[in-house]
Regions:
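Acidic-glycine-rich active-site phosphate/pyrophosphate-binding loop
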Residues: 1, 43-50, 97-112
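Glycine-rich phosphate-binding/catalytic subdomain of phosphoryl-transfer
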Residues: 1-50
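An N-terminal assembly and electron-transfer interface module characteristic of large anaerobic redox
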Residues: 2-14, 20-22, 132-866
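A short glycine/serine-rich beta->alpha loop
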Residues: 2-3, 38, 60, 114-120
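Beta-strand segments within the central parallel beta-sheet cores of soluble alpha/beta enzyme folds
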Residues: 26-33, 68, 89-94, 117, ...
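Adenine-nucleotide phosphate-binding core of ATP-dependent small-molecule kinases
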Residues: 50-79, 794, 798
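Glycine-rich phosphate-binding loops at beta-strand->alpha-helix junctions
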Residues: 72, 81, 86-110, 121-122, ...
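Hydrophobic helices that insert into or interface with lipid environments
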Residues: 116, 120-127, 135
Length: 866
C-alpha cells in the first residue's frame, strides 16, 4: 500500500481523458495504438499534469500522450508502492482501473507474461473484505442492530480495558499541561505560546518560567480546521506541514492580542549517547520562529517575539544563558529570571521522567498475548490531533494498547557505532526506538513521517533497515490526508497483525539488549581498489587527478544517464532530493557494468540538511541488496583542511574547475588540454591571466546553488544559456568550501594560517580573471551578510549560498538559484527574504530531472523582462 495517499489512478485517468477530449471508453485503445509513448516522468500523478500539458504544446500525438500516461502511472506505482519489495512470478492485477487496457498493457510491459488480470478485478476488494468479515465473525451470531442505532451504543460497548488504554494514552498530554490554567489577569502582560514543534517538549519549562515572573501564559489550542485554514492562507513558502501550521498558531495568538510570542530557535539539541560534533534540529527549527514572525509582521501589531537560541549541545548552561538573555527584553532583572528558570527546568525533568515511568509500568504488565502499538514520530507529531491524523484514537478504539516513543528507554541506547554521523537527535531517538521495537516480539511500530521533510526522506530508509522483516505501518502526513485512506491502512495493518502468532518473551529478556551493527565509512580511499568519483562538471578531471596523485586508481563515473537515474529512483520511497537517486543510481549502474570490488566517493557533511546522510543511507541500500563489493569513501566536508592527505593539491583541484568555468566556453577545452592532470599554481595563474585578457560579453547571470545542481543535474540549462551567448557568474566551489571551513573554525584552528593563504590565492586569481571573476573581493562582507540573516544556521551551506547570491547580484543582470526540488535549505533562503535582498531579479530553478518546455518558457520569459 502507498504510505502517502489513495492511488486515485482511475479518477486521474478519467480527468486527463476529459481534459484531452478523449471519451474514457476509448482511452485505453487509443493508448495501445501509440507508436512512441511520451516520456512523462514517474512523479506523483498530480504532477504529471504539467508534463502532459508540455507534451501537448510540443505537438506530441494524443495516442503517444495517452500511452505515456499509462506507463508513468505504472512506473510511479512500481517505484513508490512496490519499491524494493520482492515481486514473485505470478502477479494478479485487480481494481476498476483494469477496465483500461492501456494500464494493463503498461504493467505487462514491465513484467511480461507474469501479469494476469483477475477475472473479478472490479469487485475483488469487496470480496476480500467480505471474506475477512466472515473470518472475524466465525460461528458467533451477529450483533448488528442497524445503521440507525444511537451512536451512544458504540460508546457503551467500549470495553473497560479499551477505556483504560485510552486513559493511559491521554495521561502523557495531561502531564505536559500540568500546572497550566490559561487564565488571563488583565493587570498582567501575556506571553503567547504556539502549540507547535518543540513546545510539545518545552512547554512545562515555558509555563513555569513565565508564570513565576508574573506573566499570563496562553497556549494555543491543539491544531483545528481553523488553524489549518489560517496556515494555508498565510504560508508564503511550501514547507513541511508541521512548520506550515506555525502560521496558523501564531495568527491565533495575534488575534488574542498577546504582548509576546515565545517560540525558541533550536540550533542544537543534546542527545545523551551521541558522539557527533553537533546534534542539530532540522533547518526549519533553526529559522522558523523569526521567519514566520517577520512574514506575519507581528512587530507592527505591538507583539514582541521571544525566540532564544537553544544550543543544547552545550548543556543546561547554554539553555539557561539563552533564557536569561530574555531578561533585558522583558525588563526583569536576571536574578529573578534565574529563579524562574530553575522552576522551568525542574518541570521539564519531571515530565520526561513521568512519561518514561508510564511506559515501563505498561510494559511490565503486558499479558503474553498482548500486542502493543508504538507511535513513532517526533513529539509534536504524537500530540497534535492533525499531525497524528487521529491515528492513536483509531488504534485505541480497536482495542489495542498504544504507547509512544517517549515511553521507551530509547535515550539510553548507544547507537553511535552504527550511525556515526547521525546528527539529528530525533533521528537517533527514532532509530533507537526502532531497535527496541524490532527486538521486542510483541511491540509493533506505527511510523508517521512528514511530507516535505528532508530528514524523513533519509530516516525512512534507515528505519526500514532496522525493522527488517517485522511488519510496521508507515503513513506520511500532509494537509491533504484522507480519513478514509488512513482508516483503510490501519485496518489492513491490524488485520496482518491478527494473523501473526504471539511470541512469548524469552526468559530473562532485557529490552535494551539490542543488536548494534557497526558501520564505519572511511574518509580516505584504499589503494587496493579503484575509486569512482561522481561527475562534477569541470571539476571532475582535476579532482580525479588529485586522487591519482595520492596513488589511488581514480576514475570519474559517466554523466548521469536515464538508466542510472531509474536504478536510483527504484530505491526511493518519498521526496528524496534529486542528488540521492543520482548518486545511488550511478553506483548501481557501474556495478552492473563491472561488479568487481570498487570504491565510490560520496562526501558527508556534519548537518543539518539531508545531504549529509546520503552516504549512510546509500550504504544501507547497498547492504539490503547484498552488494558488499561497492565500498563507500565518505570524507567530512567541514574538516577537509585537517583530514585531506594534501590540502594544497585539493584546493588547486577546486580552483582549476572554478577557472575553467570562469573562461568563455570555447576556451575551456584548450586550457584543460594544456594542464597537467592536476595543474600546479603556475599553470592556474597563467590560465587566469589568459582568461582575464578576453573581453566579457553577453548578459551576465549569477548562478548559486548546490554543487551537483550547478554542474551535473541542471538538465543542460546552464550550458544552453552559455551557448546562446550569456555569461554565467558561477559561485566558485573553492570559495564555497573555504567559507564552510571558516564557518567551522573550531575544527580547523590548526589550519587557520593555511586558510588565510588560500583566501589570498583566491583574491589573486580573482584579480587575474578580471571581468570574468566570480570570487568575492571582500570575503568578510560574505560573513557579515550571513551573520545578519542566518546567524545560527547549519545546513546545505545555506549561509554561503544566501550571502553569495546577494554579493553576485550587484554585478549581474539576474540571479539564478539552483537546488533540488523539495530541498529544505532552499525554502529557508526564500523564507529569509533572499529575493528582496538581491539587487537583481531572482529566478529559482527547482530541479528534479524533469525540465521541459514549460519550464524553459518560464525561464525565458523571466530573462526577457529582467
Amino acid at each position: 500500500m502507498n504510505k502517502i495517499c489513495a492511488a486515485g489512478t482511475g479518477s486521474f485517468v478519467e480527468e486527463q481523458a476529459a481534459r484531452m477530449g478523449i471519451p474514457l471508453a476509448e482511452f485505453g485503445q487509443l493508448a495501445l495504438s501509440a507508436e512512441h509513448p511520451a516520456a512523462l516522468g514517474e512523479r506523483c500523478t498530480v504532477f504529471i499534469e504539467t508534463a502532459i500539458a508540455s507534451a501537448a504544446a510540443e505537438g506530441v500525438p494524443q495516442a503517444d500522450i495517452a500511452a505515456g500516461l499509462c506507463h508513468a502511472i505504472v512506473q510511479n506505482y512500481l517505484h513508490k508502492v512496490v519499491g524494493s519489495k520482492p515481486v514473485g512470478q505470478h502477479i494478479v492485477l485487480q481494481g476498476g482501473v483494469d477496465y483500461n487496457p492501456g494500464i494493463v498493457a503498461a504493467f505487462q510491459a514491465a513484467y511480461g507474461s507474469r501479469v494476469r488480470v483477475s477475472p473479478v478485478f472490479s469487485i475483488s476488494g469487496a470480496y476480500g473484505a467480505a471474506l475477512l468479515a466472515q473470518e472475524a465473525v466465525g460461528d458467533t451470531s451477529s450483533q448488528f442492530v442497524g445503521f440507525d442505532s444511537p451512536a451512544q451504543a458504540a460508546e457503551d460497548s467500549r470495553s473497560a480495558e479499551t477505556q483504560r488504554n485510552i486513559d493511559f494514552y491521554r495521561q502523557a498530554d495531561n502531564l505536559l499541561l500540568e500546572g497550566y490554567t490559561g487564565k488571563r489577569d488583565p493587570r498582567k502582560k501575556t506571553v503567547g505560546v504556539p502549540f507547535v514543534l518543540m513546545i510539545h517538549k518545552f512547554f512545562p519549562m515555558a509555563n513555569a518560567f513565565f508564570t513565576s515572573l508574573g506573566f499570563n501564559v496562553v497556549l494555543t489550542d491543539p491544531t483545528s480546521e481553523e488553524t489549518i485554514r489560517l496556515s494555508q492562507q498565510l504560508a508564503q513558502s511550501e514547507t513541511c506541514y508541521p512548520v506550515k501550521l506555525i502560521y496558523g498558531h501564531m495568527q491565533q495568538l495575534i488575534d488574542q492580542k498577546v504582548d509576546y510570542i515565545f517560540l525558541p530557535t533550536i540550533h542544537t539539541m543534546k542527545h545523551e549517547k551521541s558522539r557527533v560534533k553537533h546534534n542539530y534540529g532540522c533547518v526549519y527549527m533553526q529559522t522558523a520562529a523569526a521567519s514566520i514572525a517577520k512574514a506575519l509582521d507581528i512587530e507592527s501589531k505591538g507583539i514582541t517575539l521571544l525566540s532564544p537560541v537553544f544550543d543544547l549541545d552545550f548543556g543546561q548552561e547554554a539553555m539557561a544563558s539563552a533564557m536569561l538573555g530574555l531578561s533585558k527584553i522583558l525588563g526583569i532583572p536576571k536574578p529573578f529570571c534565574a529563579k524562574a528558570l530553575l522552576s522551568g527546568a525542574m518541570a521539564v525533568r519531571r515530565h520526561t521522567a513521568a512519561v518514561e515511568k508510564q511506559g515501563k509500568a505498561l510494559l511490565a504488565t503486558l499479558r503474553p498475548d498482548d500486542k502493543v502499538l508504538v507511535l513513532i514520530t517526533r513529539n509534536y507529531g504524537v500530540s497534535d490531533p492533525i499531525l497524528n491524523m487521529g491515528i492513536p484514537e483509531l488504534l485505541l478504539e480497536r482495542g489495542y494498547k498504544v504507547i509512544t516513543l517517549s515511553h521507551l528507554p530509547g535515550h539510553a541506547l548507544d547507537i553511535a557505532d552504527e550511525y556515526e554521523n547521525l546528527y539529528y537527535p530525533f533521528g537517533q531517538h527514532i532509530l533507537s526506538g526502532a531497535k527496541l521495537i524490532a527486538h521486542h516480539p510483541n511491540l509493533y511500530a506505527v511510523y508517521l513521517t512528514n511530507h516535505g521533510c528532508g530528514p524523513d526522506t533519509m530516516l525512512s530508509h534507515l528505519f526500514k533497515q532496522e525493522m527488517g522483516d517485522k511488519p510496521y505501518l508507515q503513513i506520511e502526513v500532509d494537509e491533504h490526508f484522507s480519513n478514509v485512506g488512513v482508516i483503510t491502512r490501519i485496518e489492513a495493518f491490524l488485520n496482518s497483525l491478527n494473523h501473526r502468532p504471539v511470541e512469548v518473551l524469552p526468559k530473562n529478556f532485557v529490552l535494551e539488549q539490542v543488536d548494534i551493527r557497526p558501520c564505519h565509512l572511511p574518509a580516505v580511499p584504499e589503494k587496493d581498489f579503484p575509486l569512482w568519483l561522481p561527475p562534477l562538471g569541470e571539476y571532475t578531471a582535476s579532482l580525479t587527478g588529485y586522487f591519482r596523485a595520492q596513488g589511488v586508481d581514480a576514475h570519474a563515473l559517466p554523466h548521469l544517464s536515464a538508466h542510472a537515474l531509474s536504478l536510483g529512483r527504484a530505491e526511493t520511497s518519498a521526496k528524496e532530493y534529486l542528488p540521492f537517486p543520482a548518486l545511488l543510481g550511478g553506483i548501481l549502474a557501474q556495478q552492473e557494468v563491472d561488479p568487481a570490488p570498487a570504491q565510490f566517493l560520496i562526501p558527508q557533511t556534519q548537518g543539518a540538511e539531508a545531504d549529509g546522510q546520503y552516504a549512510r543511507v546509500i550504504r544501507a541500500v547497498l547492504d539490503r541488496r547484498g552488494n558488499q563489493s561497492a565500498k563507500l569513501v565518505s570524507p567530512m566536508l567541514e574538516t577537509l583542511p585537517a583530514t585531506a592527505q594534501d590540502r594544497d593539491a585539493l584546493f588547486r583541484a577546486l580552483l582549476a574547475g572554478d577557472i575553467l568555468y570562469a573562461a568563455p566556453a570555447a576556451m575551456r577545452a584548450g586550457i584543460a588540454a594544456a594542464w597537467d592532470t592536476l595543474p600546479g599554481w603556475a599553470q592556474l595563474h597563467k590560465a587566469a591571466v589568459e582568461i582575464g585578457r578576453c573581453p566579457a560579453t553577453g548578459r551576465r547571470f549569477a548562478t548559486v546553488g548546490t554543487p551537483l545542481c550547478l554542474t551535473e543535474l541542471d538538465s543542460g540549462v546552464l550550458s544552453t544559456l552559455e551557448a546562446e551567448g550569456s555569461q554565467l557568474l558561477r559561485a566558485p566551489l573553492s570559495e564555497a568550501l573555504w567559507f564552510l571551513w571558516k564557518d567551522n573554525m573550531d575544527a580547523n584552528k590548526p589550519c587557520a594560517k593555511w586558510l588565510e593563504q588560500m583566501a589570498q590565492e583566491m583574491q589573486t586569481i580573482g584579480a587575474e580573471l578580471g571581468a570574468h571573476s566570480t570570487f568575492a573581493q571582500d570575503t568578510a562582507a560574505l560573513f557579515e551578510t550571513a551573520d545578519t540573516i542566518l546567524p545560527h544556521f547549519a545546513g546545505g551551506n545555506g549561509r554561503y549560498r544566501y550571502a553569495k547570491a546577494v554579493e553576485l547580484s550587484g554585478r549581474a543582470d539576474a540571479v539564478l538559484t539552483l537546488a533540488p526540488r523539495y530541498e529544505n535549505a532552499a525554502t529557508i533562503l526564500d523564507m529569509r527574504g533572499l529575493r528582496d535582498a538581491c539587487k537583481a531579479p531572482l529566478f529559482q530553478l527547482s530541479l528534479d530531472n524533469d525540465w521541459d518546455e514549460t519550464a524553459w518558457s518560464r525561464l525565458r520569459s523571466f530573462l526577457y523582462y529582467c
